[in-house]
Amino acid sequence: MSISLTVNGKAVSVDAPADMPLLWVIREQLDLVGTKFGCGRSQCGACTVHLNGAAVRSCVTPVSRAAGANVTTIEGLSPEGSHALQRAWIEHDVAQCGYCQGGQIMAAAALLAKTPHPTDAQIDTAMNTNLCRCSTYPRIRAAIHTAAKTLSASATPAQKEG
């Protein structure tokens, strides 16, 4: 089945079974390997991408659900260079093994898009299903706060209003 979608701002057409997980299309057909396979059951968050701006687990999202949609992977989060979250991750030395980080950052980006100034409780709720084997959760929270401040400082007046 031919499925058309937009990935990281680029229109693509893929040939895949409708029920193939979006993760495998992203990694195997589009060669975007920043999105990781962790559990295959939507439990760890390593495969998190954005589908029309919402964070989804690509390991359980059939590619047919992405037909005509906009998909953003970690590679497309900031076409101009490093995203504020990526810079904050480095500043706070979040990554140890790094395997979960793409999914963590994508989940955090979805949170900040909806909640520009999240509280610790909001961060914990939004991030509680993204697992980090190295347990860098306090640094993840600190990095999200830092990125929120950076994004707020660089927002235009119209963006700040709403």
What label would you give each PLM region?
Residues 1-162:
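Signature of N-terminal electron-transfer/Fe-S-associated modules in redox systems
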